[in-house]
Amino acid sequence: MRIIVLGAGVIGVTSAYFLAKAGHEVTVLDRQAGPALETSYANAGEVSPGYSSPWAAPGIPMKAAKWLFMKHAPLIVRPTLDPVTWRWMLQMLANCTSARYAVNKGRMVRIAEYSRDVLMQLRADTGIRYDERMQGTLEVFRSQKQLDGIAKDIAVLKADGVPFEVLDREGCVQVEPGLKPAAHKIVGGLRLPGDETGDCFLFTNALAKLAEGLGVRFVYNVDLKRLRRDGDRIAAVETAQGDYIADSYVAALGSYMPGFLAPLGLDLPIYPVKGYSITVPILDEAKAPVSTVMDEYYKIAITRLGSRIRVGGMAEIARFNKDLPPARQATLTLSVEDLFGGAGDQKKAEFWCGLRPMTPDGTPIIGKTKFGNLFLNGGHGTLGWTMSCGSARLLSDIISGAKPEISTEGLDLSRYR
C-alpha cells in the first residue's frame, strides 16, 4: 500500500519506519529542511512511562490559580479572548476529577509502557544510538507536603506494575551524587528505575536514515496546502509543489493538525502548549546529573544527554507564540543551578521553545477518522518522545489490518463524540 505521512517529527518518522517495516511504500512530507526541527528538536529528553500522567488532575485548578502569581511559575497563561483557547481550557478543567484522572492516566500508561517495550526492541534490532541512558528518573520534592502528595501516584504505579522507589534525602544523593551540595533543599524523592533518557532529535534523525534504508522517501521544504477529498476518502495532498497521491494518509502534524484538518470537518481538541528548554555543555562531571531529575516545585526536568545537560519544562498558554522571553530562561537556569550548581556552562546555554500538541485529557489521538483512508497520530503533549514508538507501531497495525498488541480503547478520535 502507498502511504503518505504528513510530518517529520518523532511521531511522523516513527510512523513511517514501522509502516515501512510492515511492507508499505511510504513517503514523508514536511515543511522543514529535515527531520525533528520543531517540537522534537530540544525537548526534555525523557522516556518516562512511569510519569505518564494527565495535566488535568484533581487539585490542578487551585494550583494553577496560585501559579499565576509566582515569579518562576510552571504555568503561564497569556490573557486572551480567543475562543479556541477558552474552549480547550474548559475541556481540560472538565477532566480534573478523580474519576477522569484515573481513566486518562490508565490510557496514557498503557501506550507509554508499550512504547518503551517497542523502543527497547527497536534498539536491540538496529543498534540505534541517541545519547541514551537507562538509569531511571528521579523526582525530587522540596517539602514534606509535596512528598506526601504522591500517594495517589504510587497507587497507580502499583496497580500498573511499574517499579518504583520512595527515597529519603540520602537515597536521592546516592542515585544522583551531584545533588549532595543541595541535599538540604530536598526532603526526598520518587525514583522510577525503568525509565530512560535520550536525545529525541538524534533519535529521529537516526531513525529517518534507517527508514530510508527500508525505502521510505522523505520530501522536505514542502508547503502543505490541504487534503483534497473525494466523498468519504482522501484523494490527494495538495502542496505548493504539486499534488501527492497515495492509498492512505497519516496526519502527524503536531499542534498544526487541527487547523490543517478543520476544512474536512474534523474537530481535534489539540492545543499548542508552549514549553521551554536550555541546553548547556557540562563543566564539571561530578556536579552533573546522572540521568533525569525532575524538580517538582518548578515542574522542570534536568536531563543528562551525553556531554550536555538539557533543562526543560513550564507550560505557556499562548496559541502559536514562539517568543523567547529572558524570564523563562531565568526560571530554567534557577532550577538547574539550585540543584546542580556549577555543573553546566550557563554562558553557552542554547535557549529554545516548542509547541507541545496537548489534548485536554492528556491521551494522544491514534487511529481512524470518518474518512476511510485518513489516520491520525498526534496530541501526545509532553510525552511525544515517550509514546512515539508504541503509537507508531500501534498505528501501523491498525492500517495494516493486523491485531494490535495492546487495547486501542479510548485512543482514537471517537472518545470526544
Swiss-Prot record:
GO biological process: D-alanine catabolic process
Enzyme Commission number(s): 1.4.99.-
Purpose: Oxidative deamination of D-amino acids.
Source species taxonomy: Bacteria, Pseudomonadati, Pseudomonadota, Alphaproteobacteria, Hyphomicrobiales
Identification of the protein by name: D-amino acid dehydrogenase
Keyword Nucleotidyltransferase among record annotations: no
Record pathway: Amino-acid degradation; D-alanine degradation; NH(3) and pyruvate from D-alanine: step 1/1
Transmembrane spans: none
